[in-house]
């Protein structure tokens, strides 16, 4: 049974080369720094770490950086991080679905990863095997499930939409899984406001015109229904959870 919604070749094309550039006002970076004291963390691993930019969030706090990815170029990340003054550990070229971790880390993170699998709950739980006792887990995904996010993607970026398992974009299910496995929830929320992006590079002027007016209408409708722009599952572009592993956790 096929469990992956994307192929390795897709990620090689999309991610390209190593890239450690991450803006200071990056939404995901700000969300993590707001909700987690990084000074308590000594080591971190990112699952699906290539091209490397999100690891800089932790590296800027002198945390040892580690990563796992099935893209072969991941093996060059250690040298690149060291050249840029970061503390680098191991960078593993392996398939997360079959790899058995040899050690555990103070913090385990993945960004836009779990939703690319049919069996997303298994993938979600596999993260637990990497987390040390009293360590932290960070999981983030785009929110394609909310109406204001789902409709334009379904209409105008369907190919990319189908690369994602929308069922995985469920914060309540994430919380339930973590609580059942003896994790303490530190933060769980939809965030990022209402933003839209897509991978459809069509230049058809009729397509672009319809897309423009549809998105304009959605923005107006969102502002009417949610005038205070409070983040929620209907329109926010991201969902994320930060949790702490307790000592009595079986993983």
Residue ranges and their predicted role:
Residues 1-103, 107, 111, 124, ...:
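Conserved N-terminal segment of class I S-adenosyl-L-methionine
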Residues 65, 137-138:
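A short hydrophobic/small-residue beta-strand
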Residues 101, 117-122, 149:
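Short N-terminal helix/helix-N-cap motif within the alpha/beta-hydrolase-1
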Residues 112-116:
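A short His-aromatic
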Residues 121-136:
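A short glycine-rich, Lys/Arg-flanked "PGG" loop and its adjoining helix->strand segment in the class I
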Residues 143-165:
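Short, glycine-/aromatic-enriched active-site segment of Class I SAM-dependent methyltransferases
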Residues 153-154, 187-251:
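A C-terminal cap/extension of S-adenosyl-L-methionine-dependent methyltransferases
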Residues 166-182:
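Short alpha-helix
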């Amino acid at each position: 049974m096929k469990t992956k919604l994307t192929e390795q070749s897709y990620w090689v094309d999309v991610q390209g080369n190593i890239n450690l550039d991450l803006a200071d006002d990056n939404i995901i970076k700000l969300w993590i720094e707001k909700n987690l004291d990084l000074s308590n963390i000594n080591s971190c691993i990112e699952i699906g770490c290539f091209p490397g930019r999100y690891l800089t969030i932790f590296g800027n706090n002198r945390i040892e950086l580690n990563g796992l990815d099935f893209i072969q170029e991941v093996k060059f990340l250690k040298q690149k991080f060291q050249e840029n003054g970061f503390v680098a550990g191991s960078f593993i070229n392996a398939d997360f679905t079959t790899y058995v971790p040899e050690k555990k880390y103070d913090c385990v993170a993945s960004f836009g990863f779990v939703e690319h699998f049919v069996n997303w709950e298994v993938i979600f739980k596999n993260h637990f095997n990497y987390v040390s006792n009293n360590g932290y887990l960070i999981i983030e995904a785009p929110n394609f499930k909310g109406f204001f996010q789902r409709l334009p993607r379904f209409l105008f970026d369907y190919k990319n939409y189908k690369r994602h398992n929308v069922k995985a974009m469920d914060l309540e299910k994430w919380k339930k899984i973590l609580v059942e496995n003896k994790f303490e929830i530190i933060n769980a929320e939809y965030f990022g406001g209402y933003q839209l992006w897509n991978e459809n590079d069509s230049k058809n002027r009729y397509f672009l015109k319809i897309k423009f007016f549809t998105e304009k209408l959605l923005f107006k409708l969102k502002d009417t229904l949610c005038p205070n722009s409070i983040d929620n599952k209907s329109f926010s572009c991201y969902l994320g959870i930060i949790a702490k592993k307790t000592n009595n956790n079986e993983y």
